[in-house]
Amino acid sequence: MPTLDAPEERLRKFKYRGKDASARRQQRIAVSLELRKAKKDEQALKRRNITDVSLDPSDQQTKGVSLTLQEIISGVNASDPELCFQATQAARKMLSREKNPPLKLIVDAGLIPRLVELLKSSLHPRLQFEAAWALTNIASGASELTRAVVVGGAIQPLVELLSSPHMTVCEQAVWALGNIAGDGPEFRDNVIASDAIPHLLTLVSSSIPVPFLRNIAWTLSNLCRNKNPYPSDHAVKQMLPALFYLLGHPDREVLSDTCWALSYLTDGCDARIGQVVDTGVLPRLVELMSSSELNILTPSLRTVGNIVTGTDHQTQLALDAGILGVLPQLLTHPRPSIQKEAAWALSNVAAGPRQHIQRLIACGALPPLVAVLKNGEFKVQKEAVWTVANFTTGGSVEQLIQLVQAGVLEPLINLLTIPDNKMVIIILDVLFFILQAAEKISQKENMCLLIEGLGGLDRIEALQLHENHQVALTALNIIERHFSEEEETVTAFRARDQDHKFLKDLTNTYHCCTTPKPGPRP
């Protein structure tokens, strides 16, 4: 487990004060890697073509015929096209069972080379279709099964079938290639190297049936998927115009997979983000962030969240496209997963220059942000804490005062009791910077009184005895730097300046913005 920085080093990292927003955002991206790895990807890597046997039209022709595995092996290798077709179809049906399909059994029987050969039977499109379907389902299995399909030489014949005049054959080839590409970057790049992308793009048109277009969008998303390495720049440039076109399609599954594709392409360096942003997709993505369909909202929000991890210019383009008109609303979404993504996106906006922070204030993001700090699920609260942390490290004194006036202190102080040492240290750093900002306008004592009145001083003092050395030192630093006056001095100050406008305004703000403290969190 990596060790935490020494207090001085950690504080130095937080002392950007708006001078290096790019470095601050990169620090946030590095920390968010843990969050990214923990996220469950809602999009399927592979899909098996399952058929309800009772609804399969081919059953009417083969009713009563049930071939054994040995008969299938013999038939698939037969020279008689009709016998070969029946055996290949029987193999496909076995592989299309909803439960426990014998994928490995078929592979171990050595049928893949013959199935690949049958893909080239241009005079028998029904046979091509059944062979492609069987290979699709084998490739939907574990990586070793997908590898068997690739090693068996299936990619190039499948790519050639993308030009088949028979739509069912062509669509099944698209599906098979999608499963192969979805296995990982190695096979994805094999598919790309076989010139699959230009063939796929010729299929994208307004006349294509929607179910077919769904398969194309999903396969393209798998060609955009995976890092280490990313897909090549050339491949990305080929796909982006088609993705831009698909982003305007009304079908929700097409939209979902297209948004996922864009989320994969933006989950990387600034140059990758720039390629996507330059296509002009941002206005449409912002529009889709208001979708009531979770399978569209999630990847569109993820994509925008990725974009604002980029350069200040890229973030500016996202702001100009209207993301701040949607993100505050998403903090109140009924799904915590959406709240978390929205807070993460806001944290990266807050990691930018002060003009970005000002736009965050102007859009009304602070009240819902404070609300999730108070009452959100812990995973959402953590992202909200990061937003506040980035805000305080880059914001001006005036902006920090607005943050305090929004009621941020009470929930932050309440979170000092959470069993997450990293978060506690970040919150302590936030309080440190707020006190520093107050000191710059000669209002530190008032801020100290406000923190004390909210129970903050007691909690910070208690943290000096925390078992975690970093937490204890950070708390001690705040006490020594900002709360070291004698009690008599503080008491005299309170009596003398009870009606001080600054303290009065903040106190009134807290009366208006805060609610009774919630009970202990589970």
From Swiss-Prot:
The keyword Nucleus applies. Its main location: nucleus. PROSITE patterns: ARM_REPEAT, IBB. Expressed almost exclusively in ovary, in germinal vesicle (GV)-stage oocytes, but not in granulosa, nor theca cells. Detected at very low levels in testis. GO terms for biological process: NLS-bearing protein import into nucleus. It holds the Pfam family Arm. The keyword NADP does not apply. Residues 1-57 form the IBB domain. It is found in: Nucleus. GO terms for cellular component: cytoplasm; nucleus. Keywords: Nucleus, Protein transport, Repeat, Transport. ARM repeats lie at residues 100-140, 143-182, 185-225, 228-267, 270-309, 312-351, 354-393, 397-436. Signal peptide: none annotated. It comes from the Eukaryota. GO terms for molecular function: nuclear import signal receptor activity; nuclear localization sequence binding. Binds to importin subunit beta-1/KPNB1 via the IBB domain; this complex dissociates in the presence of RAN-GTP. Shows a limited binding to the RB1 nuclear localization signal (NLS), but not to the SV40, nor NPM1 NLSs. Interacts with RSL1D1. Binds to the NPM2 nuclear localization signal. Belongs to the importin alpha family. Functions in nuclear protein import. PANTHER family: IMPORTIN ALPHA. This is Importin subunit alpha-8. It comes from Bos taurus. The gene is KPNA7.
